[in-house]
Amino acid sequence: MMPNRTSTTRFPITVDAALRAAGWQPGRWDIKQAEIWADTLRAHTTPGGHEHTVSPAAVECWAEFGGLRIAPKGPGRQLTPSTFRIDPLAGLHMARTLADLGRALETELCPLGEETTADTTAPQSLLAIDTEGRVYAIDHTGDWYLGPDIDAALTTLLSGAPPIRLTAG
């Protein structure tokens, strides 16, 4: 067990506090909204003909965390923790970008949400999830690996742990 967890929390204490402050609670599950997002993404085709991939891993994340704007509840370990929202429509027009990165990673990616500035909600990076549940961020400086699953990614974003930069080779 990690030292900053209690026996009753799924997440580290500061991550759990941020999630609960945003409206999350254990058992939260809005599959109806998740399916609406899935249908919207499936129906969208870019002018270049690119379409979104929708995976069960993405739908499950949207059902549990969708619609939440999550802000950190304390200082970061090594970086300033991120404020973000889980809303796949933030990536509606990013089908080609996600397809290109997915091809490089030999997987398929689906939009998850976006990192924002804490005070203005201006987008800073696109959050994406692959078919295995791994989570990534894509911004103007590059592509980043946030964790092997949504729990690890939330911890990375909210704790100020550095993400892993994706590089060629």
Language-model-detected regions and their locations in the chain:
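Compact, glycine/acidic-enriched structural inserts
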Residues: 136, 141-169
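A surface-exposed partner-binding patch
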Residues: 1-123
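Short, surface-exposed charged micro-motifs
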Residues: 125-127
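Short acidic-glycine loop/turn motifs at beta-strand connectors
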Residues: 129-132
